[in-house]
Amino acid sequence: TRPEELAITETELKNAETALDHAEKNLQETLLNSYTKADDAVRNQADQLFIEPRSGNPDLVFSLLDQNSYVEPDFDSTDGILIEVESRQIEKDLMVWVGKLNTASVAEVTVNLSKIKGFLDRLALITNALVEVIGLTQATIDDYRGAVATARADINTAINNLFTATEELNNAEASLALVRRELSLDQAGSLPQVILAQVAKVNQAKAKVAIIEAQITGGRIVAP
């Protein structure tokens, strides 16, 4: 391998190391942003549908049983209870998450986002089925649907961003490993050439010594 080829590979190595550093920082930033989006989706959007959502005993702001004269199929008596229980659990998850914000792994954040997505998807099924009744206007229903839609969009964005950042890191690690292997092969390939060059110099020196010895033997010294 020629020196200029080695120089090119060494430059590629530096670029790959820079790309990996960027990917690592981007992933860390994405993990932090995931919490921000999750917090906004739950506490600024979905919590509008609950009374005292952070109290440990949240209640929906509307009664699902009031809807059963108007919707098909009817809401089950446990639908409201289950979504309220899930809301309470999501609040607990967010509190745990923020406590380890700088150390949460990709796997942990992925699980958190997945839980919130499932919660919001089920909440959307409820709000999309709501109809106007006494104490619940269509404008209010539209507000609830809009809040849940915004929350779901936030979470989907967070999930997609995390996937992209993880893929970028994986690709950067693979690229760096490849360049390191190429550089190792290039350096190994240059070794025989270096040895041959040194051997040639040694042989050349030996030839000069042989000429001098022959001239001495002949009784005269002539500059080689």
Which residues does each predicted region cover?
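Extended amphipathic alpha-helical segments
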Residues: 2-26, 33, 157-223
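Long, amphipathic, heptad-repeat alpha-helical coiled-coil stalk/linker regions
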Residues: 16-169
